[in-house]
């Protein structure tokens, strides 16, 4: 284990087009095989599509979508006396943001539209309206935490 303590958190650099750090985080989540130019093209085209379909600012819509996907609670496994309990815990803001981006991109990839740009556009629009698979994942996570509320005293 390192003796110096945890590495400091580096600030997220805002993207050059929208000037929003959340967009550059989304680009990095879409990124595959180091092809950042392609990832940026996908995200920027998707955000342009969101602005065209929605008539509102794309970054505002993206933030609204992430607010609808961001979880407040999750369950963590905790072993107590030979049995494993699913213990509900509050999600820290940084992890909640990371999970929201991960779920948004994962469920965008699994959609049926032809191009990744269309998939991401429609998933962002669905999430901003409270629909879509990413929002359902958040609801399932909250439901799981609610049903295991009896084990909340095992929190650490």
UniProtKB/Swiss-Prot annotation:
Q: Which GO terms describe its cellular component?
A: small ribosomal subunit
Domain of life of the organism encoding this protein = Bacteria
Stored CDD domains: uS7_Bacteria (cd14869)
Give the Pfam families listed for this entry.
Ribosomal_S7
Q: Which GO terms describe its biological process?
A: translation
A molecular function annotated in GO for this UniProt entry is: structural constituent of ribosome
Family statement: Belongs to the universal ribosomal protein uS7 family.
Any idea what job this protein has? One of the primary rRNA binding proteins, it binds directly to 16S rRNA where it nucleates assembly of the head domain of the 30S subunit. Is located at the subunit interface close to the decoding center, probably blocks exit of the E-site tRNA.
Q: How does it assemble?
A: Part of the 30S ribosomal subunit. Contacts proteins S9 and S11.
> What name goes with this protein?
Small ribosomal subunit protein uS7
Say which species the protein is native to: Clavibacter michiganensis subsp. michiganensis (strain NCPPB 382)
């Amino acid at each position: 284990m390192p003796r110096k303590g945890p590495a400091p958190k580096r600030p997220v650099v805002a993207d050059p087009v929208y000037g929003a750090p959340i967009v550059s985080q989304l680009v990095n989540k879409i990124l595959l095989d180091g092809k950042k130019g392609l990832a940026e093209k996908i995200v920027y085209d998707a955000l342009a599509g969101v602005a065209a379909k929605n008539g509102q600012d794309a970054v505002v819509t993206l933030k609204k979508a992430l607010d609808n996907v961001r979880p407040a609670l999750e369950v963590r496994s905790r072993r107590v006396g030979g049995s494993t309990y699913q213990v509900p815990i509050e999600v820290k803001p940084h992890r909640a943001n990371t999970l929201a981006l991960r779920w948004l991109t994962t469920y965008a990839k699994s959609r049926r539209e032809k191009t990744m740009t269309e998939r991401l556009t429609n998933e962002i629009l669905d999430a901003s309206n409270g629909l879509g698979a990413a929002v359902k994942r958040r609801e399932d996570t909250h439901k799981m935490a609610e049903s295991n509320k009896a084990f909340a005293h095992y929190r650490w």
